[in-house]
């Protein structure tokens, strides 16, 4: 009768749950972290270490967090936690962007615009309350992601101290000579009723009209003479322009040509029966004439654009307005006609070239910019013959103007085209350039552009292409419009002279005095401030500016208002945001940092891509492909979301779908099961009593510690360069290959069958202990909840949190001068694979049921055989096979053969051994098992 030897085996035992059950366990951990003040404890534990400051770019305090928020915050959290483990003190102060239009719009929907139900002060208070509510909602979800930080003391741009520090920061920018004021064309949103910064613009397709308009020459003979041609009597000459913005024609003050472009004087279609010749860029003449219905290109003369400089044309419908031909570098012969209608109030290049020619002094502000902030023509806008423009919105005016031009004969061609056009990022509506009085941070006045380009070169950019991208943006960007004509924001706290419009000569001193008051009472102080308090008798000569600062200035100065204010080093070690922030926060921070201190405010800058579905499509409600982080946490847990983010290539678009989440859940189970197996086999192990020194370990145990050391070197280096996908891949590979397919499988025999305190068993447990200690740290930045859970189950003293620890220092490489090196083990593992290939067909044809039923013969060259023969008694444990014989052969290759064993099977260890039944007390056991149960136990050196 078979005895039950199960009680003599040391099978795995642990209370560490097989199932993560993360949606239930994670909230309980969060409550404990909150109760114990985990962030404060981690900071206190790290006191005195070198600082690593990842400065948080503030999300906007409006609406629930979405998947992009989760990606951003979790990437930051992974870095912060990895820095604690790397021996740094890594403070993380989350922040929120609280001023600006989206919040104003939310309040307007409820209470109407300022002056309807609320005055400006009441309106600002409602904005403040709304933003505070939104912060609380977002903070709850950010914490649920497992992100640690100073959540009780975040920075908020609406805090009085922040607002005051922002005014002080602006004063510093002014002191350094970067502020300017002017009437310039700026991006303008008619729905916002305000200027927009570059970062507030996004491009979308728009269908626009295209028109070719003839500008008749005042003196046709003079134009012809420039081409070396004499005109016949009655022949007209005109310069056609091509535009997609007919609404700007009332503001047309010149036509620009390219000085070095080649132009031709060609025959066009007759105008009211009279011949009309046209001036067109030579490269475009054929295409243009085809649009006008003229088949043949009849050229009468050639000239450079420079030959036509300052010749006069007539406006196509304001006949009394002289339109000079001028020369501009922005003109090309890529498309159109090579002649560009120039409206300085509605284009930056138009403005610059008109300024060079002195055109701005010849016209009134209403002629330069005839539209108001709503996009409607001013009452003073002259009509087009009988067509009234005053009061008409520009988007409706296009067709009206085209019809009027058709009636006058000035319209040569009209069509429509779809093209990429700037839109307001908030309203998703088309915007326009509009010349208005604004405050700017000049890119040239105090060399800001050049200094910023130099500063970019001092920063480490991840990915590296980020450097060229932001440099190109800085190189080509216009002055920064920092003024906004809105209510909810930080005021540009300047006094300007009523007659000259110049800021007070003591402006920055006065701003700092205003900041003291704002720090006590918030921005409302500015609007209630009696100027006489600061200006005394001068008060009657000055007006307070009512414009507020661009919200990108709010967030752009956080290196001063947050880092410096809280005693943290500047520049920060790292800024990390989405790739759209090269034109947003990275850029506004760079410009303010350089404007204030001549240096970039960050040492490293890292960008991540946007989230898309498995087909590469942007996630949206309309497509039904959106996945919210709240849903993932509710169904799978935050650690699964964190694992996906870490495993994705965040430098590009990040794909997510239910199938991808399922794959990550499977990967999580593999990691968790590995941890559970390690813990199960560490049952009864006390590192203080049972730890076997590395040099005394069984060879395979020493090798797995060596492999763990190699992996830790790679993992810590990958964390340092923010390559989290390599970490996840390395972990999964280690769990599947090194541990799952090899080490854990091979060591089961020792762990289960040897005496509890046998050196071979304690050696395996010691190796597993080292691996587990390292493993919990490796996963902690990514799988924060699971690492915390695992930490509590590890043998030995593990109080507090894994983040109190640093990278595990119990690992070491195998000595290069050891009797058997890691290279020797690698050769034996290759032999193990060779054995498996030999056994596979034997299993398939039924010759054996399991590898333990096969006896192996290895034939190798004499030197290799001599090296392996001392191991041959234990090779069966490495191969998990029957007995192994190593023989020398005259060959350079290694040959493996196998045959089914005829030996009896031990019911306890399942090995087939000749010694089974040799002890009458245990007729079904091999001698090894008998010794392990009752005797001194077996010894292992190798496997």
From Swiss-Prot:
Its EC number is 6.1.1.5. It is found in: Cytoplasm. It catalyses: tRNA(Ile) + L-isoleucine + ATP = L-isoleucyl-tRNA(Ile) + AMP + diphosphate. L-isoleucyl-5'-AMP binds at residue 577. It comes from the Bacteria. Its cofactor is Zn(2+). One of its GO terms (biological process) is isoleucyl-tRNA aminoacylation. InterPro entries: aa-tRNA-synth_I_CS, aa-tRNA-synth_Ia, Anticodon_Ile_BEm, Ile-tRNA-ligase, Ile-tRNA-ligase_type1, Ile-tRNA_ligase, M/V/L/I-tRNA-synth_anticd-bd, Rossmann-like_a/b/a_fold. It holds the Pfam family Anticodon_1. A motif ('HIGH' region) lies at residues 59-69. Its main location: cytoplasm. Zn(2+) binds at residues 906, 909, 926, 929. Disulfide bonds: none annotated. A motif ('KMSKS' region) lies at residues 618-622. Keywords: Aminoacyl-tRNA synthetase, ATP-binding, Cytoplasm, Ligase, Metal-binding, Nucleotide-binding, Protein biosynthesis, Zinc. GO terms for cellular component: cytosol. Binds 1 zinc ion per subunit. GO terms for molecular function: aminoacyl-tRNA deacylase activity; ATP binding; isoleucine-tRNA ligase activity; tRNA binding; zinc ion binding. ATP binds at residue 621. Catalyzes the attachment of isoleucine to tRNA(Ile). As IleRS can inadvertently accommodate and process structurally similar amino acids such as valine, to avoid such errors it has two additional distinct tRNA(Ile)-dependent editing activities. One activity is designated as 'pretransfer' editing and involves the hydrolysis of activated Val-AMP. The other activity is designated 'posttransfer' editing and involves deacylation of mischarged Val-tRNA(Ile). Belongs to the class-I aminoacyl-tRNA synthetase family. IleS type 1 subfamily. IleRS has two distinct active sites: one for aminoacylation and one for editing. The misactivated valine is translocated from the active site to the editing site, which sterically excludes the correctly activated isoleucine. The single editing site contains two valyl binding pockets, one specific for each substrate (Val-AMP or Val-tRNA(Ile)). Monomer. This is Isoleucine--tRNA ligase.
């Amino acid at each position: 009768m078979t005895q039950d030897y199960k009680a003599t085996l040391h099978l795995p035992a642990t209370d560490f749950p097989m199932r993560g059950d993360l949606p239930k366990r994670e909230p309980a951990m969060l409550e404990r972290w909150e109760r114990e003040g985990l962030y404060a404890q981690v900071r206190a534990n790290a006191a005195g270490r070198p600082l690593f400051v990842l400065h948080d770019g503030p999300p906007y305090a409006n609406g629930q967090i979405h998947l992009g928020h989760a990606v951003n915050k979790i990437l930051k959290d992974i870095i912060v936690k990895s820095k604690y483990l790397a021996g740094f003190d890594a403070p993380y102060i989350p922040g929120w962007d609280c001023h600006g239009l989206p919040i104003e719009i939310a309040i307007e929907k409820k209470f109407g615009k300022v002056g309807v139900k609320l005055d400006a002060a009441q309106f600002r208070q409602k904005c403040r309350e709304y933003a505070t509510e939104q912060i609380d909602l977002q903070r709850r979800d950010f914490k649920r992601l497992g992100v640690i930080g100073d959540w009780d003391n975040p920075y908020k741009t609406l805090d009085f101290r922040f607002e005051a520090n922002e005014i002080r920061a602006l004063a510093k920018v002014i002191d350094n000579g970067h502020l300017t004021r002017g009437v310039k064309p700026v991006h303008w949103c008619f729905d916002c009723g305000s200027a927009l910064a570059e970062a507030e613009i996004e491009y979308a397709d728009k269908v626009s009209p295209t028109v070719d308009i003839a500008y008749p020459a005042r003196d046709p003979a003079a134009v012809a003479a420039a081409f070396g041609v004499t005109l016949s009597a009655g022949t007209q000459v005109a310069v056609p322009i091509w535009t997609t913005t007919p609404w700007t024609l009332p503001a047309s003050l010149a036509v620009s040509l390219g000085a070095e472009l080649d132009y031709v004087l060609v025959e066009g279609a007759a105008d009211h029966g009279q011949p009309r010749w046209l001036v067109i860029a030579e490269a475009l003449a054929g295409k243009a004439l085809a649009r006008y219905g003229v088949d043949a290109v009849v050229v009468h003369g050639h000239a450079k654009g420079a030959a036509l400089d300052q010749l006069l044309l007539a406006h196509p419908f304001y006949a009394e307005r002289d339109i000079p031909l001028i020369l501009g570098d922005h003109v090309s012969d890529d498309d159109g006609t090579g002649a560009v209608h120039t409206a300085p109030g509605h284009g930056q290049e138009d403005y610059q070239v008109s300024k060079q020619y002195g055109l701005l002094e010849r016209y009134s502000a209403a002629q330069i910019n005839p539209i108001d902030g709503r996009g409607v023509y001013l009452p003073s806008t002259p009509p087009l013959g009988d067509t009234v423009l005053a009061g008409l919105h520009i988007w409706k005016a296009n067709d009206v103007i085209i019809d009027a031009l058709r009636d006058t004969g000035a319209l040569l061609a009209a069509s429509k085209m779809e093209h990429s056009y700037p839109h307001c990022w908030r309203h998703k509506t088309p915007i326009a350039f509009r010349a208005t009085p604004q405050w700017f941070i000049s890119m040239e006045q105090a060399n800001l552009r050049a200094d910023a380009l130099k500063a970019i070169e001092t920063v480490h950019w991840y990915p590296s292409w980020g450097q060229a991208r932001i440099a190109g943006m800085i190189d080509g960007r216009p002055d920064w419009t920092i003024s906004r004509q809105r209510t909810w924001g930080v005021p540009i706290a300047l006094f300007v002279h009523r007659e000259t419009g110049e800021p007070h000569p003591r402006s920055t001193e006065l701003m700092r005095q205003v900041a003291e008051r704002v720090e006590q009472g918030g921005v409302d102080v500015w609007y209630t401030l009696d100027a006489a308090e600061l200006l005394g008798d001068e008060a009657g000569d000055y007006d307070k500016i009512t414009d507020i600062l661009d919200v990108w200035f709010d967030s752009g100065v956080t290196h001063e208002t947050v880092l410096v204010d809280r005693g943290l080093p500047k520049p920060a070690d790292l800024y990390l945001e989405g790739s759209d922030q090269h034109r947003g926060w990275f850029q506004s921070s760079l410009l303010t940092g350089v404007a204030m201190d001549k240096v970039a405010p960050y040492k490293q800058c890292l960008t991540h891509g946007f989230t898309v579905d498995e087909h590469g499509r942007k996630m949206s409600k309309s497509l039904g492909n959106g996945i919210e982080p709240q849903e993932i946490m509710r169904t799978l847990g935050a650690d699964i979301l964190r694992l996906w983010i870490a495993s994705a290539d965040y430098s590009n678009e990040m794909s997510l779908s239910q199938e991808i989440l399922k794959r990550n859940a499977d990967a999580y189970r593999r990691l968790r099961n590995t941890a559970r197996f390690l813990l199960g086999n560490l049952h009864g192990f006390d590192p203080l009593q049972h730890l076997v020194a590395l040099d005394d370990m069984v060879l395979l145990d020493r090798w797995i510690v060596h492999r763990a050391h190699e992996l830790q070197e790679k993992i810590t280096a990958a964390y340092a360069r923010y390559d989290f996908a390599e970490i996840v891949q390395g972990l999964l590979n280690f769990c599947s290959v090194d541990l799952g397919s090899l080490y854990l499988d091979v060591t089961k025999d020792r762990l289960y069958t040897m005496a509890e305190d046998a050196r071979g068993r304690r050696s395996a447990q010691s190796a597993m202990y080292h691996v587990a200690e390292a493993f919990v740290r490796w996963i902690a930045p990514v799988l924060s909840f699971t690492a915390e859970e695992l930490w509590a189950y590890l043998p030995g003293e593990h109080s507090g949190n894994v983040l109190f620890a640093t990278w595990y220092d119990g690992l070491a490489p195998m000595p290069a001068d050891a009797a058997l090196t890691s290279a020797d083990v690698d050769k034996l593992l290759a032999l193990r694979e060779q054995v498996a290939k030999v056994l596979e067909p034997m299993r398939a044809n039924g010759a054996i049921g399991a590898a333990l039923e096969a006896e192996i013969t290895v034939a190798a060259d004499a030197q290799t055989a001599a090296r392996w023969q001392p191991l041959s008694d234990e090779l069966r444990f490495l191969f998990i096979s029957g007995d192994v014989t190593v023989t020398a052969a005259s060959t350079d290759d290694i040959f493996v053969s196998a045959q089914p064993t005829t030996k009896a099977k031990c019911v306890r260890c399942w090995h087939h051994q000749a010694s089974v039944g040799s002890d009458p007390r245990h007729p079904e056991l091999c001698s090894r098992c008998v010794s392990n149960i009752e005797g001194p136990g077996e010894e292992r050196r190798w496997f």
